[in-house]
Amino acid sequence: MTRKYLLVAALCIAAPCAAQRGVTGVRDAESLRAAARQFRTSHEPKILREFADLLAIPNVAADRANIRRNADLLITMMRSRGVDARLLELGDAPPAVYGDIIVPGATRTVILYAHYDGQPVTASQWVTAPWSPTLRSKSLEAGGTAIQFPTNTADRVSGEARLYARSAGDDKASIMAMLLALDALHASGRTPSINIKFLFDGEEEAGSPHLLQILERYKSLFSADVLLLCDGPEHQSGQQQLLFGVRGVTGLELTVFGATSALHSGHYGNWAPNSGVMLTNLIASMRDDDGHIKIAGFYDDVAPISSAERAAIRAVPPVDSALRHSLGLKRTEANNAPLAERLMAPALNLRGLSFGGVGDHAANVIATEAHASFDFRLVPNETPEHIRDLVDEHIRRQGYFVTSDSVTTDMRLAHARVARVEWASGGYPANRTSMASPVARAVISVVRDSAGNPPIVLPTMGGSAPSYMFTQVLHVPVIILPIANYDDNQHAANENLRLQNLWNGIETYTQLIGRLGSVDWR
């Protein structure tokens, strides 16, 4: 039955007086935490079944039919909770899912953003099928075995259990947590303290190529005080974190060419140019072994880390040594510089390399072409367009004729070195929100009370998200609230969610929806 959110008392939205605010805030937080926990423990089988049903639908953005099935199911899930939900459509692009709860008397409005699409999969790399949700007693790396989904509340499942499926952590967990927070509030007889606007993106993993147009077309729906970008993992220490920025991103597919046909390496080696060697030398000219980018002008627009940002980084619990140990790394780049500091810098990542064959597929030939795939992570003041120009010019300076077209024999005959560059159509710049703004302090306060201790606060996450669009079009600050476990195999095979992270996420969103409108935003 659809629920109507009508305020019957001002207590849900009125801020307590200054003398009582601290005590009242703690009591409210404890009460909401208990309510969320009570709801969850009484409904675990139903929660996990609903989550599994959502995870069972393939969700690669290019699979339009299944993306639509995801969107339709989300509409059903939202409407069942009293959310006024609809699809925001733009041609044949994956629809964005929108919904809102407008609370009479609420003075603050929050957009909750997440994405319902996931990364493409190579099914053969998964222990169990990526869209056949599987519950395990613990992580695969720790020897976890498959267990049955609970069928009644007496069947207790450990918080260390893992749910394996594509998008279990990235990013359907956040969608589930925020919708279940509505259930927890309703079950406890409470009302949201804020107006809520949900926005679920259907092609974030494809670079959100249509999101800007959707925001512009439906801009009137999105008046708000802040947008919480609900994506990403917890800190590697296992603590809750809040992040106030993202790095930008752009992608490149690069191909260099040798002879028009594969040549016998004995008859033509040391004479015919080897495309694999050409490509690896070109890559070495772009980046050194410590991650420093050698492309001229790449760092010209990069601002130094501010004193406030350095202070935030210094306050982060040290995790680098433990991470190196768990990942089997004797050293990390930049003379073992802290991870949080390295995420403040731009990066060039080699995603893949392909030419010839290895092992049983090796042949004594000189490959006709060699291919590499890159992503570039950008920081504020850098734009994808400028980075593309710098990279193209760098390749030319290495003696290459650069084209984005198909390479012909005439091109090979006319130029000693030929490179085809194919830049991804998506991509976006970095974005940051002040960590000291009133809205930042309000969100930090509520999350602190929810967790019982201060969250880790960082200027940026290492990954990328289209948050600049929200700042550019909607003129709202963006704060990132991740809930997934840091070892969730995000974007990789055997993606998973630790159940305790979902349980904690429900409590966090219950606090935010239930209390954010009643704390001091000054």
Give, region by region, the residue ranges found by the protein language model:
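Bacterial N-terminal signal peptides that target proteins for export
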Residues: M1-L6
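Hydrophobic h-region of N-terminal signal peptides that target proteins for export
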Residues: A10-A18
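Metal-dependent amide/peptide-bond hydrolase catalytic core
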Residues: Q20-V26, S31, H235, G251-N496, ...
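Acidic/His- and Gly-rich active-site-bordering loop/insert found
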Residues: R21-A168, A187-I194, F374
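Short, solvent-exposed loop/turn segments at the edges of secondary structure
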Residues: T107, T128, S193, S223, ...
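Acidic/histidine-rich catalytic neighborhood of metal-dependent amide-processing enzymes
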Residues: D155-G245, D520-R522
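Short glycine/serine- and small hydrophobic-enriched flexible loop segments
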Residues: L180-A187, N281-S285, F376, Q511-G514
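Extended, hydrophobic alpha-helical segments in both membrane/secreted and soluble proteins
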Residues: I196, I214, L228, V443, ...
